[in-house]
Amino acid sequence: MKKVKFLLLPVVMVMTFGCQKFFDVNPQGVASPTQLKSKAGVGALLVGAYSLLDGVGSGTTQWHASVDNWVFGGVASDDAVKGTDAGDQPEQSFIEQYNWVADNTHFRGKWQHSYDAIARCNEVILFATDPDVKDMTDAEKTQAVAEARFLRGHYHFEAKKMWGNVPYIDEKTYKPNDPTGVLVTNTADIWPKIEADFAFAAANLPATQAQKGRATRWAAKSYLGKALLFQKKWAAAKTELLDVYNNSGKSLVTSFHDNFRTATNNNRESIFEVQFSINDGTGGQNGGKGSTLNWPYTSTSPGRGCCGFYLPSHNLVNAYRTDATGLPLIGAVADGSQDTYNNVDVPNDQGLKFSDAWTLDNSQPVDPRLDWTVGRRGVTFLDWGKMPGSSWIRDQNYSGPFTGKKWMYYLSEENSTTHATDRRSVNNNFRLIRLSHVILWLAECEAELGNLAQAQTYVNLIRNRAKGSPVQDASVNTKVEPYATGTFATRGAAFAINAVRHEQRLEFAMEGHRFFDLVRWGIAEKVLNAYVAKESVSGRGWDGRTFTKRAYLVGKTFTAKNNLYPIPADEILNSQKDGKSVLTQNPGY
């Protein structure tokens, strides 16, 4: 544990809240512990704990702890490549190529941010339960603690899925004035304590909150269900998730794309949303700065010219291929090894200049979610016109022909959506948990429990929404249909599990989940080595054109140790007590 992280940090005092989102507030001064022993003080501490949800503000590099986990959950998976060019952010290249070492500063930044945030949560709990706080009712204190425990559960969850073997720090362990006293081993399983945080939050939070962005009962129950899901506790996870599905009042929005627009922030599908804001006096720091590198590389595109990172892979684009009946090209093996979608590539302009003649071949169908997720040449890009090709890509030969699209803003909304002096700072919230997550997690539970018909029902809810959503470009050949009655039961459990997993990929691509899903399913090594083997060689589109893919991936291998990231070397060094490190490194590093 990094010693300095557990010193009592100066805490921002926020005495009043205006019409801004409740944690988009400028620092107003430094408060003493005495001042914090009040309703306003506890509220300010809680704002501080919420404020780190976006991954920015703990002193680390912005993208090391971005809420969307685009490096650790996306670039490390088969969804995306690093992008940009070979020389930019080489530490990310090491992550992409599974060459992981404990002194990579990306790992330390994520660790530092996680435990800084946990410390803030513990401060809230300590002050909220202090008997010297006289101007809060017991109910108000309980709710403050419940919100802090929800956040503490989230931040520990983030650490757990990264490193597996991590210390759990609660308000009893936390000793800001005794850095060595807080040192805790990382050998115990912390899942029960994460569960306890979410369970307490679920029992003590209201179903709705007046201020958008605050945790609710349904957010806590959803997260508890997710924690149980990660442990393969299918029946227990189903209980929590089914309560959310049946009783939260949430429903799917009509258009898939409405989960990714500023105009539809905090919509009826959203269960827990990280709030972004702009023009609030912070210089754009509250505008999703963890993703500041992930914009097309030209001044005539969203973001206005930087920096070309986090680009969709050919494998991901091909995953959206469908057959003539609108169903995915997947097989009856749960690890996806019999899937055929990656046998032929979706036609693309890899290797061509934007000025070279090229026409998109639409002779085969794709799922319409593809063109709300990925920017590709010849297809309308929101209201920016047709994506022009390599002029939007920093180095197409290195990073490929596609660009991210899910979180991009409309040209017509640029002034209202972006910061006045930084077009890469936006007020488009990150939907951390939405009802579609809950539905597909329920589908996963049912498939694993053998209830295949019910699993199919849940999957079809998502596929029917995709079918009914507006298409991005009417000229594209799109086709998506629900599975026919009895398909899962007829084709068996392995097919059903694979279909659920594939649907999660299609629905949540480029949102930073894929790597962690592959790991928890126990198929990361097989899937990612197959991905590297195919993504590193020449491709061939169904139009017959051949092209070179990512040659730098040749010979790269994912091994069993890569299921967990290495614990930062500095954190192990700083955990020394009586000359011996308390933290233990993960196997293989």
PLM segments and residue spans:
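Bacterial Sec-dependent N-terminal signal peptides
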Residues: 1-27
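Long, intrinsically disordered, low-complexity segments
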Residues: 18-19, 73-76, 83-86, 114-117, ...
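Membrane-proximal, proline-rich intrinsically disordered regions
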Residues: 19-71, 579-589
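Conserved, well-structured interaction surfaces
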Residues: 39, 43-47, 51-57, 83-163, ...
